[in-house]
Amino acid sequence: MSSDDEGGEEYLFKIVIIGDSAVGKSNLLSRYARNEFNAHSKATIGVEFQTQNMEIEGKEVKAQIWDTAGQERFRAVTSAYYRGAVGALVVYDISRRSTFESVGRWLDELKTHSDTTVARMLVGNKCDLESIRAVSVEEGKALAETEGLFFMETSALDSTNVKTAFEMVIRDIYTNISRKQLNSDTYKTELSMKNRVSLVKDDNKSSTQGFGFSCCSSS
């Protein structure tokens, strides 16, 4: 726990996982939060979330990660689902091109229902399915660079890059928050566990510039 002058204050960052149905959102979350994978998991009904703790610069950070169904019939939860989010993982399945083509729609929805400064990562999931790949790494990187997103390919099945992807988003949120006047009473209130964080940046240049990572890399 932190021993700084804020008395080990904890911060809560709400992160949402979005993307088409069956791209592996729930398994990404369960792999990160519980190190579990269910090959026969059914489509998420409604909304669920998991909380994961990290320590960054001596401060306890809680990431509350929300998962919801991608099917159109569940879109009624949209506003509440996005409210207060400061980070988002936009997920597609590298073996299903249609899910990649839907990324633009999900980004538009994210922009509509959340602050434009949300830390965002494009995630090409199921990179273990290399033999039936339908979206190249280069295409994923190019889209991420165009939209100003981090990019990473993951596999919830074998854990490739899952922890790295989530923690990169969490650290980016923390970095953005740290740029602000954390000693001000306003930000202490916003960032306390009693309130959901609202992320505001000083400028329009997001630090979430395109990052390219291949799940097949050795690093």
Curated annotation (Swiss-Prot):
Any one of the GO BP annotations: protein transport
Lipidation (S-geranylgeranyl cysteine): C215, C216
Subcellular location: Cell membrane
Molecular-function annotations in GO: GTP binding; GTPase activity
InterPro entries per UniProt: P-loop_NTPase, Rab_GTPases_membrane_traffic, Small_GTP-bd, Small_GTPase
Family (UniProt): Belongs to the small GTPase superfamily. Rab family.
Protein name: Ras-related protein RABA5d
